[in-house]
Amino acid sequence: MSLDVRTITPSESAEWMRAVSTGFLTAGTPSEELVADRFAGADLSRTQGAFEAGRCVATFRSFAQELTVVGGATVAADAISGVTVTPTHRRRGLLSRMMATDLAAAKERGEPVASLIAAEYPIYGRYGFGPAAWTSVWEVSVYRAGLDARRSGQPADGGRIEMVDGADVRKLGPEVHGALAARQPGVVTRDERWWRQRTGAAPSSAHEKWTEPFYVVHRAADGTVDGLMTYGTDDTWGDAKQPLNTASVRDMIALNPAAERALWHYLCSIDWITTIRSGYRAPDDLLPLLLPDPRAARMITNADWLWLRMLDVPRALEARTYGTEASLVLEVRDDAGLAGGRFLLDASTGGARCVSTTRSADLVLGVAELATLYLGDESVRRLVDLGRAEESRAGAATTADAVFRTGRRPWCPDVF
């Protein structure tokens, strides 16, 4: 039976969502409310499906996104999501066909990069994607943290913690997140639907059961909101009637270390909470060092997270700033023919110029490896040692590391 791979029509949105749910191991039919919310304002020209006898057996969509790069500028990204293939139709090239169509369209639109969160590591490298930012989850033993159990939940520097509700977060959150996005490489845009969904004002995905969380904000001494946290708790008691409750952070953004410290210390101060799970944080997050005993924080997850794919090398490299002034000739290899070439990068702390060149290459690397370097998280020397990049000029890897690396690691707090 033939397979029809194409963009979907409005009447097929519910069937497409059913296939997505199947791919994410959630049985059943999505509600009409969820389908309507998911497709409100959606660009169906960027929503693909594979159909067999009217049944959707593979899904793929993309949407417009802004990605913060090193230096605080943003680039337009082709954000890819909802990628599934029904188990009965694996290994038929369906993802490859949909990916090729989408990336070609993104390049035609002029988007310098594509982005995604990879559910599985081995899938996306063959399409030119590389892991550009990692994520970590920390588990904190409150009893071992070394904080004074008699303290209040309020900071001592004139700031204060306030409990708020979802409506407050929808009003205050976008400004705080926007300020974070202006400085943190790896942050991606959050639209209105994101805030509505994470505060219960819009239906959650079929595989995400909604429970109302707690919301708090941190106000600086002048009253400015410079941090917010969303968290849930369980209800667990030991045999001796001792509380063994865990607070699990769903979202936490802070614009300075004082706000970050105040929010974590507040969470540690709540009666009955004995364990904290941090949610997705940067691997070099300050959390352990904000506790008197950093060993109370144990990293329980450290994994690749945000994957990028270069579509326009000069535009992407010119968008970010660099650690030092240097010139490098990069030969970028791309089997898909979308972004390969030889490029001269004149980098500086204030920006860069990147153009095609015929000069001899200093470094030879794949398009996926360049994506891995783009936000400053990976070492060129490591890639050379692994055989994933070639140093054509002695010392080029050391120079490239000085150019690309950053003092703090990139971080993408979101799933999309």
UniProtKB/Swiss-Prot annotation:
GO terms for molecular function: aminoglycoside N-acetyltransferase activity. The keyword Transferase applies. One of its GO terms (biological process) is aminoglycoside antibiotic catabolic process. Its EC number is 2.3.1.-. Acetyl-CoA binds at residues 83-85, 91-96. Keywords: Acyltransferase, Transferase. PROSITE patterns: GNAT. Residues 3-150 form the N-acetyltransferase domain. It is an enzyme of class 2 (transferase). It holds the Pfam family Acetyltransf_17. Homohexamer; trimer of dimers. Belongs to the acetyltransferase Eis family. This is Uncharacterized N-acetyltransferase SGR_3976. It comes from Streptomyces griseus subsp. griseus (strain JCM 4626 / CBS 651.72 / NBRC 13350 / KCC S-0626 / ISP 5235).
